[in-house]
Amino acid sequence: MIVITCLDQKNGMMFNHRRQSQDSVLREHVAKLVANVPLWMNHYSASQFDTESIPNLNIDDAFLQEATRGEYCFVEDAPLAPFEKWIERIVIFRWDCTYPADRYFDLQLGSGQWHLVGTSKFAGHSHDLITMEVY
């Protein structure tokens, strides 16, 4: 599976059971990135996407168990460490700031297993700068 997630500058994901932020331009980038490949997510994340922009959107609260090789998973509030051996690639959309957080990204990107292979930057709708990192 290919993981897509949004993190702040300190790898924060959520605060008080809510996403830290969201951005409409980022969602457009996700739609272009996945193209016609299935994109899996849970019901919580699905509330910000629509099937018109992502025709192969699959919504299941057990999405990390359902996704197969080459399919994308948009992860906002789930631990990834139990699924790390099945993750082929990680795409992080990094906010240009730090938000309060009580849930953090639980994979160690500096452990030697993951290598940064590309970055790109773009202006979001509600963020001056969003950086896409691919591992």
Model-derived regions: residue spans:
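Enzymes that bind and transform nitrogen-containing heteroaromatic metabolites
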Residues: 1-135
